[in-house]
Structures are given as structure tokens and as C-alpha cells.
UniProtKB/Swiss-Prot annotation:
Residues in the signal sequence: 1-21
Chief place where the protein resides: membrane
GO BP annotations listed: bacterial-type flagellum-dependent cell motility; response to osmotic stress
Gene: flgH
One Pfam short name: FlgH
Spans traversing the lipid bilayer: none
Protein's job: Assembles around the rod to form the L-ring and probably protects the motor/basal body from shearing forces during rotation.
Protein name: Flagellar L-ring protein
Any one Gene Ontology molecular-function term assigned to this protein's record: cytoskeletal motor activity
Top-level taxonomic group: Bacteria
Family: Belongs to the FlgH family.
Keywords: Bacterial flagellum, Cell outer membrane, Lipoprotein, Membrane, Palmitate, Signal
Residues covalently joined to lipid (N-palmitoyl cysteine): C22
Subcellular location as annotated: Cell outer membrane; Bacterial flagellum basal body
Amino acid sequence: MQKNAAHTYAISSLLVLSLTGCAWIPSTPLVQGATSAQPVPGPTPVANGSIFQSAQPINYGYQPLFEDRRPRNIGDTLTIVLQENVSASKSSSANASRDGKTNFGFDTVPRYLQGLFGNARADVEASGGNTFNGKGGANASNTFSGTLTVTVDQVLVNGNLHVVGEKQIAINQGTEFIRFSGVVNPRTISGSNTVPSTQVADARIEYVGNGYINEAQNMGWLQRFFLNLSPM
């Protein structure tokens, strides 16, 4: 019975470790929620007999005469020009050294130590040293360029626009997703209804994909199993 219990315990342990190695680590998307917004219907206009209708909804379908048409309401669109170029480097080093030395002796050896040292003079010397050197460095560089048209999904109290958008590109058996969200100041929108991504606050840019190309970049279950077991 004890042998069977030990055998069962060993098999159960290996099974748990195997499931741990097969565990998939999900990635949290940067842009969460809906990636589009629908215009909110305005109030029904009431005709007052004048050429200019003061109650006319200027939010949708309104073209100003003396200014460019710019997004200002939920459902309006604008184009984000992606111009991200980020590079960073870091290096560090540390050195530590410590040396110690101790000498002592005695002319008369205690009786309980005569078997070890004899009756002669005894000298004891101890020395030690410890040295540590450490260096580390890291470099990162990322470049992202392109365009993406987004939709205004929220108008903030101060007039800024919260935008969100997504572009999906299917190539053969894989699909690429480009998602974007952020806060745009209407003053930074150009006459061509574009704004660079470097002028968007709280920008979230995500470029992911699925398919066999993306799966080839993931570590296999057997590799994850041995990686979890390895002490290195």
C-alpha cells in the first residue's frame, strides 16, 4: 500500500508540474472596451420662421462658414499620425571589497589544549577577503509610424476629446490589430483633421496579431515545463 501511495503521489506531482508548464500567461490589452462610438441623437429642432434657426442642432451636419470642420462631438472622426520613436539606455556597476587579518599568540598553552598545540608557544593567524564586482546594462529602441483614424467617444468637461479606434488587417492566415486611445486637445488638430500621436495625452498604442506567425513566437508547453523546473 505504501508503494502504491508513493507511486500515486509521484504521478500526481508530475501531472501538476506538467499543467504548470502548460499554463498560458494571458496578456492584458492596453486598449480595453469598445473601439468605436455612435453619435448621440440631438434634440428635435423647432422652426421659428426665421432663416437662421437658433434651435438647429449644430452638432451634426453643420458646416461652419468661417472655420475648418473639426471633430467636436461623440462619433466624429479624426486621423492620428503615429510618430513614435522612443529609445532608452541604462547602465550600472558596483564594486565592493573587504579584507581582514587577525593574529594572536600565547606563551603558555592551557592544559586542555596541550594535546593540540603541545607545551610550546602557540601562534594563531587568521585572514580573509571578500570582493564583489557587478555590472549591468539595458538598451531599448522602438519606432512606430503610420496613420489610424479614430472616433471621439467622450467629450470632457474642459473640451478635450477622448478618442479610440482600431484597425484590423487580415493577411493570409493571420490578422493584425492596431488599437489606439488617448485624449486630444482640439487646438492641436490641423486643418486636414489630423493630429500627431506625440501630442495626444494618455496615449495607448497597441499592435498585436494572431495566427500561425504569432503562435510561432510563443514558447511551447514543454519548454515552459522545463523552464519552471530549472533552478537557473
